[in-house]
Curated annotation (Swiss-Prot):
It comes from Pyrococcus furiosus (strain ATCC 43587 / DSM 3638 / JCM 8422 / Vc1). Reversibly transfers an adenylyl group from ATP to 4'-phosphopantetheine, yielding dephospho-CoA (dPCoA) and pyrophosphate. GO terms for cellular component: cytoplasm. Coiled coil: none annotated. SUPFAM superfamilies: Nucleotidylyl transferase. InterPro entries: CoaD_Thcocales, Cyt_trans-like, PPAT_arch, Rossmann-like_a/b/a_fold. HAMAP family: PPAT_arch. It catalyses: (R)-4'-phosphopantetheine + ATP + H(+) = 3'-dephospho-CoA + diphosphate. The keyword Chaperone does not apply. The keyword Cytoplasm applies. Pfam families: CTP_transf_like (PF01467). This is Phosphopantetheine adenylyltransferase. Its main location: cytoplasm.
Length: 160
C-alpha cells in the first residue's frame, strides 16, 4: 500500500513507552515510508518533571527498538536529539512531522526553523491525546509519579 509521505519525522523522550507514544509511532509508520525518530538526549530532559526518574537514553533506546521490532517496523532511523528542532533542518527531504495535540507547538517551531533556512515546511499530522481511565492524558510524568501505569490504569495504593 502506498504511503502518503516518503519521509516523516517524530520525536520525543519516549520514557516508559505508553499508549500515547505507541499511537504516535503507529501513525508515523501508517503515513510514512521511512520514519526518522528523534530521541531526546539525557542532557535535554533535565528540566522535565520528575527528571531524576526518567530512564537513561540507552534504556529508552532499547525499549523503543524492542517496540519497533515487535511491531515489525523496518524502515526507520533513530537519532539522538539535543534540542526541540533536532535534525529536522538537516534532512531537507523530510515531508511531514507527526505530533500529538499537546506537542503541536513543537511542529510549528520546527517549521519556522525550516522556513528560516529556505526549506519547505513539513505537513503536520496530528493525533489526539490518549486518555487514561482517570480521564487525564496518559503521560510519562504521571507514570513516573506512580499515579498510572503505561496503559493508563490507575495505580492502587495500599491503605495503611
Amino acid at each position: 500500500m502506498k504511503k502518503k509521505y516518503k519521509k516523516v519525522v517524530v520525536g520525543g523522550t519516549f520514557d516508559r513507552l505508553h499508549l500515547g507514544h505507541k499511537a504516535l509511532l503507529r501513525k508515523a509508520f501508517e503515513v510514512g515510508e521511512i520514519v526518522y525518530i528523534g530521541l531526546t538526549s539525557d542532557e535535554m530532559i533535565k528540566e522535565k518533571q520528575y527528571s531524576e526518574r526518567i530512564l537513561p537514553y540507552e534504556k529508552r533506546l532499547l525499549d523503543l527498538i524492542k517496540f519497533l521490532e515487535v511491531n515489525k517496523y523496518r524502515n526507520y532511523r533513530i537519532m539522538k536529539i539535543h534540542n526541540a528542532i533536532g535534525f529536522t533542518t538537516k534532512i531537507k527531504s523530510l515531508e511531514a512531522i507527526v505530533v500529538s495535540e499537546e506537542t503541536y507547538k513543537g511542529a510549528v517551531l520546527v517549521n519556522k526553523a525550516r522556513e528560516e533556512l529556505g526549506l519547505r515546511p513539513l505537513d503536520i499530522v496530528v493525533i489526539p491525546i490518549i486518555r487514561s481511565r482517570l480521564g487525564c492524558k496518559i503521560s510519562s510524568s504521571l507514570i513516573r509519579a506512580g499515579l498510572i501505569d503505561p496503559f493508563g490504569n490507575p495505580i492502587r495504593r495500599e491503605e495503611k
